[in-house]
Amino acid sequence: MSDDVFTLGPAAFGSRLIMGTGGAPSLEVLERSLIASGTELTTVAMRRLDPTVQGSVLSVLERLSIRVLPNTAGCFTAGEAVLTARLAREALGTDWVKLEVVADERTLLPDPIELLDAAEVLVDDGFTVLPYTNDDPVLARKLEDVGCAAIMPLGSPIGSGLGIRNPHNFELIVERAGVPVILDAGAGTASDAAQAMELGCAAVMLASAVTRAQEPELMAGAMRHAVEGGRLAYRAGRIPRRHFAEASSPVAGRAVLDPERPAF
């Protein structure tokens, strides 16, 4: 869909699938999955990354010409997230950051107060901030108001595979947003990615759904097609939901029996 470019901050992408790298069984499987997904933007967790190591995730992304998106996974306070983002900028030479500030290790749900504080500091510091957030339309608006380049609500908890539990909130967020809305967590299979796009999301971000699948490369390809299909369906416009049937065939030309001349 070369006529449907995905614009995110100052950059444009042909693919609307953003991949994560966590949970891959090996670098070889990860590389094949990234190729199958067609992604052009992939996240890496700074706390698990050593840029000096040869044969790392970074070398795979460089070989595939995929843009690196560092994230602040594992941060519980705004201060930790800001420090991690600044270290990433120094180490990787990018001012893009996928901002994650979670409340606890059990749920990995975003801490809205710490998240908003960190977002405001990083935007003021010149970062292109992509925040992982709750599916809360009010918080989404506040994140956009402080200057975030996108809103990335979760469909369900990270790694849960439960899909989008509150599609109505996604519709509200999309309807009010002036920046791209990206599904950021919860996808378990291709239909979840397609649903996100049909709800109006500009892109889908996922990792576990691919890296922990029985066949990661196959699932990556499925996700690619699901995102593309869901986007086409959204652009095409679905038919209205109705309580009763509506015939698709015209009435004109229908055979009508003459009661005085039985057919048999």
From Swiss-Prot:
Reaction(s) this enzyme catalyzes, per UniProt: [ThiS sulfur-carrier protein]-C-terminal-Gly-aminoethanethioate + 2-iminoacetate + 1-deoxy-D-xylulose 5-phosphate = [ThiS sulfur-carrier protein]-C-terminal Gly-Gly + 2-[(2R,5Z)-2-carboxy-4-methylthiazol-5(2H)-ylidene]ethyl phosphate + 2 H2O + H(+)
Source domain of life: Bacteria
GO molecular function: thiazole synthase activity
Residues at the catalytic site: 98 (schiff-base intermediate with dxp)
Subcellular location: Cytoplasm
Enzyme Commission number(s) from the entry: 2.8.1.10
Subunit relationships: Homotetramer. Forms heterodimers with either ThiH or ThiS.
UniProt similarity note: Belongs to the ThiG family.
Protein name (Swiss-Prot/TrEMBL): Thiazole synthase
Source species of the chain: Streptomyces griseus subsp. griseus (strain JCM 4626 / CBS 651.72 / NBRC 13350 / KCC S-0626 / ISP 5235)
Lineage: Bacteria, Bacillati, Actinomycetota, Actinomycetes, Kitasatosporales
